[in-house]
Each structure stands twice: as C-alpha cells, then as structure tokens.
C-alpha cells in the first residue's frame, strides 16, 4: 500500500517543461517535494507519500505504473460557488455501461469516505421522467439512470436527478455521475473552461492512495489549487485512518 513514511505528510509533485509547478510549490504553506522526471516520480510512487500531483510531467509512464495495481478511472473535483463535488466519468472512453458507472460511483464514494466525507451521490441522465417516449436514446438514458440509482441506494445516499444537474449541485451532492464519459467531459468543459467553476484536478480512482492528475499546461494558480486539494485529501485520509 502506498502511504507516507514515518508519519510525515509528504506531497510529491512533478515538474516538466512547464515550470509553473515550482512557483506553485513555493506559494504553498506546506512542504512539497518536487521531482523532475517520470523515473523519479515512479520511484516516489513505489517509496510512498501522503499524496501525489503529476504536475507538468508526461502522463504515459506514470499512469502505466499506477495501472499495475488494477483498472483506474478519473473523477474531477470541481467547485461551483461554495459546493464541491467529484464529477465522473470524465474520460471519453469511460462509463460506457451501467455496471461501469456503478463501479465508478462506488470507487468515488469510498474515496470520499477515506477522507472523512460522507458521500451523497447524484445520478444524471438524458431527460426528465416526463420526457420518456420522446426518443429511444432519451428512454434508454433515463431507464439506465433509474437502474443505476437502484444499484447504489443500498450503499450510499443517492438520488436520480435526471437531466437536472443544477439541482444535484444545489442539493450538495459530492459525487455526480454523468450518463457516460463523453457527457461527463462536456460537463467538465462547460463548467470549467467556458464557465467560472474551478477545477482542482482529477483523482485516480482505483489507486490505493491519493493521486491528483493535472494538465501539463496548467498555470501556477491552477497547480497551487491541485496541491492544496491533494494536501486537504491527505489530511482527511490520514485522520480517518489513525
């Protein structure tokens, strides 16, 4: 199991061609260990730390190392106003079946529980219940949303919000499950890249630890958000497991 050594909280972050991570680390009010190559980062994964932020290092070899422990899915932590939530699936090839989305919902919920947060799941589908009959695609999406909700309800607090994602956010859901990865990716881009929502990076679900994935072209401000998010997760994770 990956973790911190000797009880010290170590946050490891990668620095590639984009040096903004160095600026972000200097602004953090906690210690950040910077590494400057994929090889160093992978060695840190094997060594153990409280949390990892990929930063501006290339993804391929690092993700391959993470996947040695089993399949991974990503969930993006987004803040809209005072409300924060994990949005998944966000990879365009993820969450294609109800079973896939159930596994993602469970992984995201268990991840939050390890940080001391109680999951509240919002399931999103392609229409309101009154839209049944408008098209086969809408019908399928709504029925899948209902079925997924029935699968989750014995494990976590959950509600099927149909297409009303704004209500899921307003109600304080901290796990939001999109109808598929393409839709999740579009929701992310609409909220963060077009709108004013803030992204703190994507956590790797299925990794036995805390790994926050970030863009290689992120600003120093964006990397600082990711570092603070990783630190917040690590503190909750450690307190919950003491």
UniProtKB/Swiss-Prot annotation:
Q: In its UniProt record, which GO terms are filed under biological process?
A: methylation
Q: List GO molecular-function terms, semicolon-separated.
A: methyltransferase activity
Its signal peptide is none
**Entry annotated with the keyword Methyltransferase:** yes
Q: Which domain of life is it from?
A: Archaea
Q: Which UniProt keywords apply?
A: Methyltransferase, Transferase
SUPFAM superfamilies in the cross-refs: Isocitrate/Isopropylmalate dehydrogenase-like (SSF53659)
Q: What is its EC number?
A: 2.1.1.-
Record keyword Transferase present:
yes
| UniProt family annotation | Belongs to the MtxX family.
> Could you tell me what this protein is called?
Uncharacterized methyltransferase MTH_231
- The organism encoding this protein is Methanothermobacter thermautotrophicus (strain ATCC 29096 / DSM 1053 / JCM 10044 / NBRC 100330 / Delta H) (Methanobacterium thermoautotrophicum)
């Amino acid at each position: 199991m990956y973790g911190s050594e000797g009880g010290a909280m170590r946050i490891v972050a990668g620095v590639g061609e984009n040096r903004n991570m160095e600026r972000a680390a200097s602004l953090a009010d906690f210690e950040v260990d910077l590494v400057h190559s994929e090889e160093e980062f992978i060695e840190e994964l094997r060594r153990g730390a409280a949390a990892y932020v990929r930063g501006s290092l290339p993804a391929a070899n690092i993700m391959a190392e993470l996947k040695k422990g089993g399949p991974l899915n990503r969930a993006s932590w987004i803040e809209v106003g005072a409300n924060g939530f994990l949005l998944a699936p966000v990879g365009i090839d993820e969450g294609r079946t109800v079973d896939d989305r159930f596994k993602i919902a469970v992984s995201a919920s268990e991840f939050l529980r390890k940080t001391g947060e109680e999951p509240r799941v919002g399931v999103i589908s392609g229409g309101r219940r009154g839209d049944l009959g408008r098209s086969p695609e809408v019908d399928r999406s709504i029925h899948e949303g209902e079925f997924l909700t029935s699968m989750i309800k014995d494990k976590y607090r959950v509600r099927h919000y149909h297409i009303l994602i704004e209500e899921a956010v307003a109600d304080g859901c901290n796990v939001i499950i999109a109808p598929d990865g393409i839709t999740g990716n579009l929701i992310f881009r609409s909220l963060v890249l077009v709108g004013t929502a803030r992204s703190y990076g994507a956590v790797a679900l299925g990794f036995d630890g805390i790994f926050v994935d970030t863009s290689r072209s992120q600003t120093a401000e964006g990397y600082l958000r990711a570092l603070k998010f990783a630190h917040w997760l690590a503190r909750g994770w450690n307190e919950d497991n003491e």
